[in-house]
């Protein structure tokens, strides 16, 4: 028994104990042999052997202590063993009772047991006890000592020497356990970090932690296992043990009152049993009529909320299920019961008059009806029929009604399984419809917001286009009289004119660079209507205003403006070839005449109506409906291409070069020139003019008939527009070729006073412009001296005539009828004032030059800087 000797004793006592244990074994065997031969009782022999063992132990221990050699005492050879009956096993309760009786016999004082008895008890401690309770809380509450410890060592519980007659203990191991944690209610007087010996048949591992459920023994620090140890790392194991081992935690169960239920046949019903208190967790059992109920096909027992309640559930209740039910809850501290009733209403059957009497089916025929149907036997026809519950139909209640036709009773407190399915389906449909409505609402809101934003952007775009379509300079609106409403987007926008500065009057106008306007027109909020980029090319003589017949004017305007592809198309027709030949002949004749002509000069006033003035460009770019001036002109051989664009690219207009048209002799004359004196003198110039007129105007008669008034009087004004409106007639208040009233004899001052009024009134309405401009032009004209009808006098009468001529020439608008009447009139032409815009003609060039040399350089008028 070296395992016991090396448990917890010091070395000197260990040797003595080992020798005493050996001796006690031999003496106990001899005493048992002696007692077996005698007829005394087993108790007396056990007492004598215990007393002899005690005396022997005392003697041997004294001898061992007195011996100097230190050798272990060896007893004499034991007598020959005799067979003896096996001792009857005793229960633990009997052993504990024997121990208490021995303690009482010893004087009521507890003392250390003898070594022999300790070995006997230690052998008993190795017995395995399977736990009788399922719950860990029950085991903790039942066990006397509950600790958490760590296994430090393991030793086999081997038997004694071979000559020992004692039965070896049950197979197991002795573990040295270090106490790590304890519970106050089940501590057993142990302290933390204390080492105890525990015998257990359960497999243990070294250096592992366990919760031990122990029972104390007579020896201190020696325990036996009451239940198998458990691993504390399990799910809530330590927490469950702490719940039951705390102070005032363990209570007996107490159940709540059970509610009675009432239902129809075939419905789903349940009874609920719930514990209001109880620690450890109680277990539940159901009874009906004193008989315990178990789980079956129609009855189910379920637990919920951590086994705090139990539910008895009937899948399809029957009439025979009605009755009183008892629920019992029990734990280690006690138990409690509660009662409840289940009422089942049978289906009332209303039989028809033809069916006769009916009765319920017997037990063997009750299974004829399914799904909770009630079976009836109808006498007279000997046929079984079924009364089906709500939601089913058919002869045996096999068919199920659609959910939409199943209307449950609103008085029912507990709905069936079918009703729950219908309710779930209804909820799903409601959710689906609600989701669709919400989605449509969101889509509608998004559409409204998008429409509002698009409308706002469209309004801003239109406003931006209106701003881009407005003229870049307000001066353009003053060139054609009164202001007109804003143009539509479809109208061609007015192109900006680059040449804002009038060229110097001292320069001689001979040949100019041809300007081609490329279609680089861009509009932006910062630059409204940018001007086109000019490119220079060779150009013939400057364009002049053509005053011909209405037919020629209309054809020239159409050829100069409307034709888009004449200049580039091929000329294959005979008429085209003939026209080209005529133009070539006229052009060559003009070249010869131009070579013989001396250079001429223009004044600042003549530049106003030139093709380079802003007034000219305004009349060209303004639509015909809005402009009171219809501009007709002839183009040179090479005509620039105009391309006018608008902010809308679809409204861009491109004007390609027109057909080349040669200049006529009349076109080389200045716009407003001084007429030649009556009766053209002979010379090569007159012959050339007559031949030119006879070629182009064979029906008009000879050249001299065309008169100086036709060239000198009516050429001073622009032709009227054939598209003019009647409202603009009020601006044409002066008549140019009308003969003036006969002069009356008056003084110089009176004549000036009387004639100043109507002239000024007329000048105030020249072309719809301001009167100050007319006055400025009049002053500039009055400063420069001129001659009327070839005379160079500067008298007061000539000044009055100059004022009258100014009133006539300052208005550039003249109707076509007046122009034709002036051309065909036989009366002597009215000669305009001497100070006209152009100071030369073909016949009076030398006269004009001589007058200039005689008077000196004329005083130049101040250039009109007002808006045109």
Curated annotation (Swiss-Prot):
Pfam families tied to this protein: I-set (PF07679), Neuregulin (PF02158)
Stretches in topological domain Extracellular: 128-429
Region ranges (Disordered): 1-114, 469-488, 516-553, 671-690, 720-806, 823-868
Residues that span the membrane, as ranges: 430-450
Functional summary from the UniProt entry: Direct ligand for ERBB3 and ERBB4 tyrosine kinase receptors. Concomitantly recruits ERBB1 and ERBB2 coreceptors, resulting in ligand-stimulated tyrosine phosphorylation and activation of the ERBB receptors. May also promote the heterodimerization with the EGF receptor.
Glycosylation sites: 33-34, 163, 294, 362
Organism: Rattus norvegicus (Rat)
Protein name as catalogued: Pro-neuregulin-2, membrane-bound isoform
Occurrences of domain Ig-like C2-type (ranges): 253-348
GO CC list: extracellular space; GABA-ergic synapse; glutamatergic synapse; plasma membrane
Domain EGF-like per the UniProt entry, residue ranges: 357-398
Comp. bias intervals (Basic and acidic residues): 538-551
Assembly, per entry: Interacts with ERBB3 and ERBB4.
Record-annotated disulphide pairs: 273-327, 361-375, 369-386, 388-397
Family of the protein in this entry: Belongs to the neuregulin family.
InterPro entries according to UniProt: EGF-like_dom (IPR000742), Ig-like_dom (IPR007110), Ig-like_dom_sf (IPR036179), Ig-like_fold (IPR013783), Ig_I-set (IPR013098), Ig_sub (IPR003599), Ig_sub2 (IPR003598), Neuregulin (IPR040180)
